[in-house]
Amino acid sequence: MHKTERGDAMTALQQQDPEIFSLIQQEEVRQHNKIRLIASENYVSSAVLEATGSILTNKYSEGYPGKRYYEGQQLIDQIESIAIDRAKAVFGAEHVNVQPYSGSPANMAVYLAFLKPGDTILGMALPHGGHLTHGSKVSISGKYFNAVSYALNEEGILDYEEIRNKALECKPKILIAGHSAYPRILDFAKFREIADEVGALLMVDMAHFAGLVAGGVHPSPFPYADVVTTTTHKSLRGPRGAMIMCKAEYAKAIDKAVFPGMQGGPHDSTTAAIAVALKEASTDSFKKYTAQVVENAASLADVLIEKGFNLVTGGTENHLMLIDLSNKNITGKQAAKALDAAGIVLNCNSVPFDKRKPFDPSGIRLGTCAITSRGFAKAEMVILGNMMDRVVNNFEDSAVLAEIAQEVQALCDKFPAPGLEHIAK
């Protein structure tokens, strides 16, 4: 069992609320002891954690730098301006808004800026790798707007001619390029051509691969996109926040949609943490990190394919993989539960043309961002792939799962996670 040691800040929490302190402590141990493969998760640095938990949470800052409704903003304005400037430098954006609370509100703000209720949007279908906010009928994006979806072909690949035909048919006001479970690189130039042909704005949701873009290992949506949204966690290794980047001509509409359209004051501690993460993303070490993320994904994919796993699209070009387990006599939920018991954490996920229900789908989704942050490389991908194969083949054998969990913890002990270096046996 691991113990954690903290300074005065955690001691104060322990004294004030030992119940919450204990749960946080247990979560720290869990994050250390487990191999975390959830594609949308990562480990942030101690510097990002420090900014996130700073006294900036005490401040209220409605408005934008130089145009606030409350006084006492001199330092907050500097912090937000630094975050904006760093985002522009990292991504080459003309305008940046760093205030959205998370990815979904960021996407909603874009719709608020350019659409009226009932207008048409065209995005990737959720069961084929899209996101709830790209027009799913259970999301506000699918309730307030006429949401049309494009799908993948039988090989699990985007068919740009089919997307073009859909766009010509429905004439969307916004064409959305982005995903939450698509392991291939998007062709932004083709999306731009389609958008221009039908007179649509091109919105790119790069929440999953923003860090890869920053690191130069994934094509950039600039200058093709009119608007780009992203979360600041996932592959970017920042806090739980979001950004909207756009061409200068859309700056006023975007800013007005975020505030006062969607939300009140920004979370200043998050803004500071975004600035810190963007500084980290501008370094050579971050470029090496993102290259390793992609290399690890490819290496793990090779091992899993060799073990007979059916990877949707036959592999990966980014950080994530989607695996169809139909040939393994196990459902996605069963696999996710068994892997978790063995110390390997990921999520069950629908696959294209899935015949099973969303809460008990045929597939699993995994990504390599978090394990790469720990220092895992090719050798560990071989070990991990073999572990996953053993779990799937013995998913009902609790003794085997417990044995693998011990192996996982031993492996994790060799690779301390960022922000959790204080954990010791």
Curated annotation (Swiss-Prot):
Keyword Transmembrane belongs to the record: no
Gene Ontology cellular component list: cytosol
Enzyme Commission designation: 2.1.2.1
Molecular function terms from GO: glycine hydroxymethyltransferase activity; pyridoxal phosphate binding
Location (main, coarse): cytoplasm
Class of the enzyme per the UniProt entry, highest EC level: transferase
Subcellular location: Cytoplasm
Disulphide bonds in the chain: none
Residues of the site described as Plays an important role in substrate specificity: 233
Presence of keyword Transport: no
GO biological process: one example: tetrahydrofolate interconversion
Keywords, sorted A to Z: Amino-acid biosynthesis, Cytoplasm, One-carbon metabolism, Pyridoxal phosphate, Transferase
Reaction(s) catalysed (UniProt annotation): (6R)-5,10-methylene-5,6,7,8-tetrahydrofolate + glycine + H2O = (6S)-5,6,7,8-tetrahydrofolate + L-serine
Residues that bear N6-(pyridoxal phosphate)lysine: 234
Protein's pathway: One-carbon metabolism; tetrahydrofolate interconversion; Amino-acid biosynthesis; glycine biosynthesis; glycine from L-serine: step 1/1
InterPro entries linked: PyrdxlP-dep_Trfase, PyrdxlP-dep_Trfase_major, PyrdxlP-dep_Trfase_small, Ser_HO-MeTrfase, Ser_HO-MeTrfase-like, Ser_HO-MeTrfase_PLP_BS, SHMT-like_dom
Residues the entry annotates as binding (6S)-5,6,7,8-tetrahydrofolate: 126, 130-132
Cofactors required: pyridoxal 5'-phosphate
Assembly behavior: Homodimer.
General function of this protein: Catalyzes the reversible interconversion of serine and glycine with tetrahydrofolate (THF) serving as the one-carbon carrier. This reaction serves as the major source of one-carbon groups required for the biosynthesis of purines, thymidylate, methionine, and other important biomolecules. Also exhibits THF-independent aldolase activity toward beta-hydroxyamino acids, producing glycine and aldehydes, via a retro-aldol mechanism.
The family this protein is said to belong to: Belongs to the SHMT family.
Record-given protein name: Serine hydroxymethyltransferase
